[in-house]
Amino acid sequence: MPKIGIIGGSGVYGVFEPKEVVKIHTPYGRPSAPVEIGEIEGVEVAFIPRHGKYHEFPPHEVPYRANIWALYELGVERIIAINAVGSLKEEYKPGDIVIIDQFIDFTKKREYTFYNGPKVAHVSMADPFCPELRRIFIETAKELGLPVHEKGTYICIEGPRFSTRAESRMFRQFADVIGMTLVPEVNLARELGMCYVNISTVTDYDVWAEKPVNAQEVLRVMKENEEKVQKLLRKAIPKIPEERKCGCADVLKTMFV
């Protein structure tokens, strides 16, 4: 079974052709869609469309626990997560790729843990993302000449609404990009000792910029971003070693009370 899982949108189908569909019912319900298994450049991967096959789940209703558990149950050890984000800083331009290294949780009512009792866990999130996967994707993006930021802080809001201008100006003080789907995905993966890397693609500037958003321009950038991510996945995934040496699974030794 695949050791690598991808959670993202329909753009993944540009590099991935499903060969098998696995329906899984987890202790947390059904995932966003049946897990699709196929190959990217000869490497077996499992894919879940985060928002559902037909984009039926808004960000605050995505079954995050079921998605992560389904991949875990299949034997996946590493998760590559792909997100579209808005920019909070001038230097993070539309069309850029950000390999996120930190996040701030501004969500409100999601299911954040697998351990609601009687077993209790406090997982370390000081460094939330797999250093080995981050290195591979940063180096590969540079090799391909893609516009990549090696670091970035992602603030995750509840959604589904976008920010007010006042909120956006506040968020600019402590984050670089803004989105709605990183949390609780990243901490759930950590609770199961899974590696997790986030590839965020910038679609536009958030409303702090006070520039009118051109829908056609956003759609154009999103299409270009899909193509960049497809190139990145094709080139980076074959570089991921069989054996993990990152220490992501070590959190399991210290997180239980």
UniProtKB/Swiss-Prot annotation:
Its EC number is 2.4.2.28. Pathway: Amino-acid biosynthesis; L-methionine biosynthesis via salvage pathway; S-methyl-5-thio-alpha-D-ribose 1-phosphate from S-methyl-5'-thioadenosine (phosphorylase route): step 1/1. It comes from the Archaea. GO terms for cellular component: cytosol. The record marks S163, A215 as: Important for substrate specificity. The keyword Transferase applies. GO terms for biological process: L-methionine salvage from methylthioadenosine; purine ribonucleoside salvage. The keyword Transferase applies. SUPFAM superfamilies: Purine and uridine phosphorylases. Phosphate binds at S10, R50, H51, T181. It catalyses: S-methyl-5'-thioadenosine + phosphate = 5-(methylsulfanyl)-alpha-D-ribose 1-phosphate + adenine. It is an enzyme of class 2 (transferase). One of its GO terms (molecular function) is S-methyl-5-thioadenosine phosphorylase activity. Pfam families: PNP_UDP_1. Gene3D superfamilies: Nucleoside phosphorylase domain. Substrate binds at M180, D204, Y205, D206. Catalyzes the reversible phosphorylation of S-methyl-5'-thioadenosine (MTA) to adenine and 5-methylthioribose-1-phosphate. Involved in the breakdown of MTA, a major by-product of polyamine biosynthesis. Responsible for the first step in the methionine salvage pathway after MTA has been generated from S-adenosylmethionine. Has broad substrate specificity with 6-aminopurine nucleosides as preferred substrates. Homohexamer. Dimer of a homotrimer. Belongs to the PNP/MTAP phosphorylase family. MTAP subfamily. This is S-methyl-5'-thioadenosine phosphorylase. It comes from Pyrococcus abyssi (strain GE5 / Orsay).
